[in-house]
Amino acid sequence: MSGLRQIAFYGKGGIGKSTTSQNTLAALVDLGQKILIVGCDPKADSTRLILNAKAQDTVLHLAAQEGSVEDLELQDVLKIGYKDIKCVESGGPEPGVGCAGRGVITSINFLEENGAYDNVDYVSYDVLGDVVCGGFAMPIRENKAQEIYIVMSGEMMALYAANNIAKGILKYAHSGGVRLGGLICNERQTDRELDLSEALAARLNSKLIHFVPRDNIVQHAELRKMTVIQYAPDSKQAGEYRALAEKIHGNSGQGTIPTPITMEELEDMLLDFGIMKTDEQMLAELQAKEAKLAVAQ
């Protein structure tokens, strides 16, 4: 286990976290690294592009079929994908029943006890980040993931989620070794997105590791259940993911203890960048619109 780097990709649902992480890990394996992916998102889509398949059976689903986790063997839950990347999905309960984070806790314990972490250079956790509840915070809380990479964009809710995740990291940074490795901006083509991402990273005492430009080739690859690295290895977008992988690979020991900001500070930052309008601006726009309508009548 010495030399093992345990990283985690956090981010709000729908931000492109699983796509970004799988493309980055596919690029990382090309750097000669042995990788284990542990999917910690109830959607169980953290390994699909690596396996070139539909979502794999999850630890919780298989445990329910067999009776309990103790009845499972490692080969039941571990699948081998692109260039021998090992893949596991923890899964979650049926919607509205139980805690989705429970699958994360159960899976990580099972994998550790059964030797899944042996002979790998990286363990990567792909974690839902809209809420940093006990279960989803488990890779942070139990000092499993030492480097957290937050996938975000210039959209307000993505920024809000990134700040929330930073709060979760801060909570456990002093009791364990967890650090914020940096922010990854998955471009949504919003106003001043790069500037805003760099500004938030600075406010969080971190850095923007990479700005991933938007490219339709990502969707083309996804439709074929492939990463861009596999589908179009010579494309410009594949080069972006390789650059991101190299930055993460060279970022060992560079993580920081984050300094999250308040909701008011986040809103002020958006106002400074002209992303959010003040009440006065909105009122003035409304009055101008009403005046225009009155003239037209």
Swiss-Prot record:
Catalytic activity, EC: 1.18.6.1
Pfam families the record matches: Fer4_NifH
Cofactor(s) this protein cannot do without: [4Fe-4S] cluster
Binding site for [4Fe-4S] cluster: C99, C133
GO MF annotation list: 4 iron, 4 sulfur cluster binding; ATP binding; metal ion binding; nitrogenase activity
PROSITE patterns, per the entry: NIFH_FRXC_1, NIFH_FRXC_2, NIFH_FRXC_3
Key words of the record: 4Fe-4S, ADP-ribosylation, ATP-binding, Iron, Iron-sulfur, Metal-binding, Nitrogen fixation, Nucleotide-binding, Oxidoreductase
Note on how the cofactor is bound: Binds 1 [4Fe-4S] cluster per dimer.
Name recorded for this polypeptide: Nitrogenase iron protein
Taxonomic source organism: Mesorhizobium japonicum (strain LMG 29417 / CECT 9101 / MAFF 303099) (Mesorhizobium loti (strain MAFF 303099))
